[in-house]
């Protein structure tokens, strides 16, 4: 059985969130939480919150044991971009793209064998 958690339109660039997501993909959830606690990236606490939500969903909705869960899917998609402008010299302006992410984590029980 699979349990899923999604955080949509999170204010972190997908490129930066993917760096952290690559560290935990395929790991056991306990190990993944430890990795996220020790990773000094802005995306770490956000991804940790989504992971804990997926674990809670697995325990509550499907009555799975948290100790036997593995991260089967972990990916970051691009959300809507907030377009802003930075004033420059001589009346010009430069575009600033504030990117957002959709973070998805799927956990399931570890296969025996």
Swiss-Prot record:
One of its GO terms (biological process) is translation. This protein binds specifically to 23S rRNA; its binding is stimulated by other ribosomal proteins, e.g. L4, L17, and L20. It is important during the early stages of 50S assembly. It makes multiple contacts with different domains of the 23S rRNA in the assembled 50S subunit and ribosome. This is Large ribosomal subunit protein uL22. Part of the 50S ribosomal subunit. The keyword Ribosomal protein applies. InterPro entries: Ribosomal_uL22, Ribosomal_uL22_bac/chlpt-type, Ribosomal_uL22_bac/org-type, Ribosomal_uL22_CS, Ribosomal_uL22_sf. CDD domains: Ribosomal_L22. One of its GO terms (molecular function) is structural constituent of ribosome. SUPFAM superfamilies: Ribosomal protein L22. It comes from the Bacteria. Belongs to the universal ribosomal protein uL22 family. The keyword Ribosomal protein applies. GO terms for cellular component: cytosolic large ribosomal subunit. Keywords: Ribonucleoprotein, Ribosomal protein, RNA-binding, rRNA-binding.
């Amino acid at each position: 059985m699979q349990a899923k958690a999604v955080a949509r339109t999170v204010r972190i660039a997908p490129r930066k969130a993917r760096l952290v997501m690559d560290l935990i993909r395929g790991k056991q959830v306990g190990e993944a939480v430890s990795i996220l606690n020790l990773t000094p990236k802005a995306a770490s606490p956000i991804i940790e919150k989504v992971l804990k939500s997926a674990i809670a969903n697995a325990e509550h909705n499907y009555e799975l044991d948290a100790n036997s869960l593995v991260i089967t899917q972990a990916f970051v998609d691009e959300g809507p971009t907030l377009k802003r402008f930075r004033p420059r010299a001589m009346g010009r302006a430069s575009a600033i793209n504030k990117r957002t992410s959709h973070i998805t984590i799927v956990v399931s029980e570890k296969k025996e064998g």
